[in-house]
């Protein structure tokens, strides 16, 4: 089964994560199929490639609970930012 999950990178004590598509039976930082975006919890920044995300979800990849929560929070923030500025949210480009 394919999973959209977080892959840890960054230095000790300064975590950053890549959002990747991988086989759910693989190690957390093991082989992955595609990098879909990134998340930096220290800066509270994230970037998700929605085209690739949609492509992999159509192929059967399911986000983990953590990634689903991240996507939900990120989408809510982007819609609020776009609503206030009247433009497309830069996070989703």
Swiss-Prot record:
<dbReference type="GO" id="GO:0003735">
    <property type="term" value="F:structural constituent of ribosome"/>
</dbReference>
<protein>
    <recommendedName>
        <fullName>Small ribosomal subunit protein bS16</fullName>
    </recommendedName>
</protein>
<dbReference type="GO" id="GO:0006412">
    <property type="term" value="P:translation"/>
</dbReference>
<dbReference type="InterPro" id="IPR023803">
    <property type="entry name" value="Ribosomal_bS16_dom_sf"/>
</dbReference>
<dbReference type="GO" id="GO:0015935">
    <property type="term" value="C:small ribosomal subunit"/>
</dbReference>
<keyword id="KW-0689">Ribosomal protein</keyword>
<comment type="similarity">
    <text>Belongs to the bacterial ribosomal protein bS16 family.</text>
</comment>
<keyword id="KW-0687">Ribonucleoprotein</keyword>
<dbReference type="InterPro" id="IPR000307">
    <property type="entry name" value="Ribosomal_bS16"/>
</dbReference>
<dbReference type="GO" id="GO:0005737">
    <property type="term" value="C:cytoplasm"/>
</dbReference>
<dbReference type="Pfam" id="PF00886">
    <property type="entry name" value="Ribosomal_S16"/>
</dbReference>
């Amino acid at each position: 089964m394919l999973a959209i999950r977080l892959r840890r990178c960054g230095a000790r004590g300064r975590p950053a994560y890549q959002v990747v598509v991988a086989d759910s039976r693989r190690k957390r930082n093991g082989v992955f199929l595609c990098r879909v975006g990134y998340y930096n919890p220290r800066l509270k920044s994230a970037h998700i490639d929605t085209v690739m995300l949609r492509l992999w979800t159509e192929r059967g990849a399911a986000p983990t609970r953590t990634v689903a929560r991240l996507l939900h929070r990120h989408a809510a923030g982007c819609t609020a930012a776009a609503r206030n500025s009247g433009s497309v949210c830069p996070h989703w480009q």
